[in-house]
């Protein structure tokens, strides 16, 4: 997929326009993402693991494997006018999936797939050409960047934000978090956050500018849909061009830094280790 950073519709490159999707083409395509869309074109993505709260995984049927493809399908569908991203139950992504099974023998063998999925995951999230609202329904302790890269971030009062999948788990934070968090928190606080496994509570995240609103759980989704309806009333081209200008620097930085970060993350995995020693 060709990415261009100067145009108003940066990710609607020729390859995407030529392969436009219809909602029915991908509505039931994914094992870890439930998709619905209302008549206004507001698409709701609910991440889950086997129907329950989402758990992070890297198997071939995991969120890591599917989200990049889902974001690209959404980007290719011209009927999508807003996207709401949320979790299931009372957590966004709070833990890893202990029930995963992998086709590869070790991390070194798995890395080529993880590398490609990692490139697609955040580049394709930022490639969605319409505004995105994150409704963070609980702790976002693993890959919280999925939520905070959205244009509007709403969170319930018991939500927390952390990056426990990388340095605290023995992995290099090279799959985009090294770009996202120093941008949002500032260079020093961002590095502190990544190196220490700090958990930032919802109200503190709002004070830091990471979250736009903190809400009671019962008000989270109604508020997300109210904001989506408000924005969806605008002309389509206003929505798309606004998304383009608001994400331009994020897209540029991610395109420039993600592959390099993944290379460093992969180099740290060259020593063969069992999959349960990630």
Model-derived regions: residue spans:
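Conserved CoA-thioester-binding segment of acyl-CoA-metabolizing enzymes
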Residues: 8-86
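Glycine- (often His-adjacent) and acidic-residue-rich active-site loop
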Residues: 51, 59, 79, 86-120, ...
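Catalytic-core regions built around general acid/base machinery
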Residues: 70, 117-129
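Short, active-site-adjacent cap segments at secondary-structure transitions
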Residues: 90-94, 141-142, 246-249
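CoA-thioester-processing core
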Residues: 121, 125, 140-194, 223, ...
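Short, well-ordered beta-strand core segments
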Residues: 132, 139, 153-154, 214
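Acidic, divalent-metal-coordinating active-site segment for phosphoryl/phosphodiester hydrolysis
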Residues: 141-143, 197-204
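C-terminal long alpha-helix characteristic of the crotonase
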Residues: 154-159, 211-258
